[in-house]
């Protein structure tokens, strides 16, 4: 079994309120990864963000924080969770975001999303730091098929970034640890459920539904832990309604 841990980048999903399906979806993703199944998902905005983080580090962070170093490696908080800050400035973490659209950049620098605040708080826990920083950097995305260098936005660099400094928030950090401890046993239960799934062929899956059975994707279940068993077809999991 592959070792998986709850990470800062998705910790807001564990903290989400409502029905609990957001948290359940994250726990299920980790359980799937634990048995070697991982669905890769990417969008142009995600690709843009990843490709331009180093650019933002060199253009924005390094001139202002000469001691800063690119890090992007996992740091354990405990055996169940950890964080991967993009940058370490001495012992304090920094995370860099590169919004894809101008309006997204403006919106986020006016009010940083709470999910990023939680992410930085968890990075601070990993680094045992009292301070963490969040960097927003706007750079023009490359268009599909464009072979030449991207022509940058005609705005001065000082208007294309903003850095937020956060101090340690004991309440949110304690809540993060509580949610991780609460979710770890659920992950173990889901791993067991997946490992003991009833494996059926595509043919059986097809004909059973033609004859009246109803299967739904496991992700759609309101409470996976209430299921007695699940069905596996290739690398996909379902439950019977």
Located regions from the model:
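Accessory terminal regions of nucleic-acid processing enzymes
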Residues: 1-241
């Amino acid at each position: 079994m592959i070792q998986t841990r709850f990470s800062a980048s998705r910790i807001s999903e564990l903290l989400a309120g409502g029905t609990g399906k957001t948290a359940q979806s994250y726990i299920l993703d980790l359980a799937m990864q634990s048995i070697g199944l991982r669905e890769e998902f990417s969008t142009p905005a995600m690709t843009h963000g990843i490709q331009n983080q180093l650019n933002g580090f060199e253009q924005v962070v390094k001139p202002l924080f000469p001691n800063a170093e690119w890090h992007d490696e996992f740091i354990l908080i405990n055996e169940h969770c950890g964080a991967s800050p993009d940058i370490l400035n001495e012992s304090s973490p920094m995370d860099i975001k590169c919004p894809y659209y101008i309006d997204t950049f403006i919106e986020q620098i006016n009010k940083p999303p709470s999910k990023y605040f939680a992410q930085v708080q968890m990075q601070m826990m990993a680094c045992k730091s009292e301070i963490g920083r969040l960097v927003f950097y706007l750079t023009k995305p490359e268009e599909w098929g464009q072979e030449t260098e991207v022509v940058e936005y005609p705005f001065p660099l000082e208007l294309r970034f903003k850095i937020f400094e956060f101090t340690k928030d004991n309440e949110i950090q304690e809540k993060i640890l509580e949610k991780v401890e609460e979710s770890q046993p659920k992950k173990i239960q889901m791993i067991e459920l997946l490992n003991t799934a009833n494996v059926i062929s595509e043919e059986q899956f097809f004909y059973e539904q033609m004859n009246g059975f109803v299967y739904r994707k496991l992700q759609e279940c309101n409470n996976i832990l209430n299921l007695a068993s699940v069905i596996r077809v290739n690398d996909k999991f379902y439950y019977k309604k």
